[in-house]
Amino acid sequence: VTAFASLIGAGGAPRASIELGRGNFKKAERILGTSAAFLVAIALTLTVILQATKEPVLRAFGASDANIGYAVDFITIYLVGTVFVQLTLGLNNFISAQGKTTIAMTSVLIGTGTSIILDPVFIFVLGWGVKGAAVANVIAQLISSVWIILFLASGRSAIRLRPSNIRFNRVIVPILTLGLAPFIMQITECLINVVFNVGLQRYGGDDYVTSMTIITSLMQVVSVLTNGFQQGIQPIIGFNFGARRMDRVRQAIRVAFIAQITSATVLVSILAAFPSVFAAWFTSSPEVIGIVTRMMPVFVAGWGVFGIQMGAQCALVGMGQAKQSVFLAIFRKIIMLVPLALTLPHWIGVTGIFLAEPISDATSGIVAGILFYVTYRSLTRADDAKNR
């Protein structure tokens, strides 16, 4: 669900930023309206498909006979709010694209705060259990989506969500081409989780599956911060690229690389230094804590170099360079990580699954740096030629 929201939101918002930089407000508003139409259409389609296939999908992601009932109860209700999730995640990008980061942050806090308040009420006071958590989530996403739509439709928004623009048209093509990279990066997480779970179950057992879940959950915290940097810097890159202010583009790109590489290195270093402490947040099992303690430093070893790819991806999407962004997304996950996770365990056992991550991270970071350098030089030379 999140991946499809990124396909439209993370593809449309940078396109809108570029058009704003060019002073083309009408086209930016058409991009916004078209994105809203497709977000709703995709949400309705996903709701129908996932409701029909929820049990096999949940089992593919690791649900067992012991917890499948709870998972089905949650997802059945959660999917009712798919359209709200799509609109919240997808359209909030267009608020950030205007440089209104406080409003965008408020949109997130409204949903999070509502969920925090309603969760204990529905779960414990009303005794709805896991169903209560799902209901709270749907209500929270509904409130967030209404807040975002009201803002975008108001005069406070630099680009307005107008009913006349909410329709399907060919503007979707450049949106999809640019959104394909973040879509691939997120949708392949599903594939990676399946590959990891199957391999860990085969070569290690339940404790290794649990350990990987803990490690990836902690890495999500790192990803949230790095994605936050990306959402903050990307509109600046896009706007100035559209305005052909390459000096400001250069400054923003420098900040993007420094922020991504530094934050990735510092955060994963903390995780690698105190893995047992973080593991104890999730479990009291000494076996699982022991596995996390051994494997966390291995798993995160390549993230410092991977910060180069995050910086490059941020800059390339911000400048509307779809082909290069898509290649980098495919290279890391599909070309590198999946084959390594499938083959390394044959030679070195379960450790190979954890080792696949840093190898693919470091390799893709180096490739991304080279690709970005070549692309950026080409763009700056083309801009210099136009200015002569």
Region annotations inferred by a language model:
Residues 1-48, 85-104, 211-275, 306-328:
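Small-residue-rich hydrophobic transmembrane alpha-helices
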Residues 3, 115-120, 145-149, 220-224, ...:
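Hydrophobic transmembrane alpha-helices of multi-pass small-molecule transporters
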Residues 4-5, 45, 49, 79, ...:
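Residue-level hotspots within pore-lining transmembrane alpha-helices
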Residues 9, 78-96, 104-115, 133-148, ...:
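Short runs within selected transmembrane alpha-helices of multi-pass transporters and secretion channels
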Residues 12, 53-54, 91, 118-119, ...:
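Hydrophobic/aromatic residues in alpha-helical transmembrane segments
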Residues 16-81, 125-180, 237-302, 343-388:
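Short alpha-helical transmembrane segments in multi-pass integral membrane proteins
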Residues 77, 111, 140-144, 148, ...:
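Transmembrane helical elements of multi-pass membrane transporters/channels
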Residues 91-99, 119-128:
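Membrane-water interface regions at transmembrane-helix termini and the short interhelical loops
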